Amino acid sequence: MVNRKETNLDGVKAMARTLLYTDINKTAYSPMIVQHPFTNTGFTMVMKNGTPQCIDITADSNALHEWRKMVCQQIDSSKSAFEIYMMTNKPYGMTFLKYASHHLSKKDFSQILADAWIRSENPNDDPNLPQSKLLSMFQSAEPKHLMSQDELNTLKDLDSTVTVYRGVTSFNAKNVKALSWTLDRSVAEWFASRFDEDGTVYQAQIDKSHIYAYFDGRNESEVIVDPKYLMDITESESMDNSFDITM
């Protein structure tokens, strides 16, 4: 639960420095592409004697030290938790929030949650955050700081029972009962057909009381739901071989 009235910025900074000193995970494309909370590439720029220089932080321990020193200075000079969060590598936004949450005010927590969720490519399948944790995050958030006024109005104006859609491919076909659905069937169709796949569109019913957020920042008409309250989940009628899902 997030109960702080004010953010403990020093606590957020300390947590961010801990993330900074985690190992850099190399990939098949390293040093060009790496995995780390504060960078997605092994190449970075640092200032040496007033001159910017490109260094490879995966190959030189001194270069890695210089880079971490530079990022530490940026963390320490930050004026807000959101500023520190924006320094993180996109795939690690939700991880940052997970570890920073007990230092954050409800307002900061809610604003970072909304941004991190939208920026993440596939937050429903984040291995660091089980569905129960993701759901508790949205349940703890303050709607007025989680959504824009237009988004709040859209959520408020929904019928008491809402039809929602979800498009899946072979990549996430086993995760139909996820938090993320859409009010727009065409959006679900796009998700089902991306990556040149012939995926599946599902539709379901859910009571509005079990919808925790509506996001339209990516024009996806996305709703965040409590999956256990989804009803009548079926393959969409326009797809072949309509069938019910049994759980």
Predicted regions span which residues?
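Conserved NAD+-utilizing ADP-ribose enzyme module
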Residues: 1-163, 170-179, 185-246
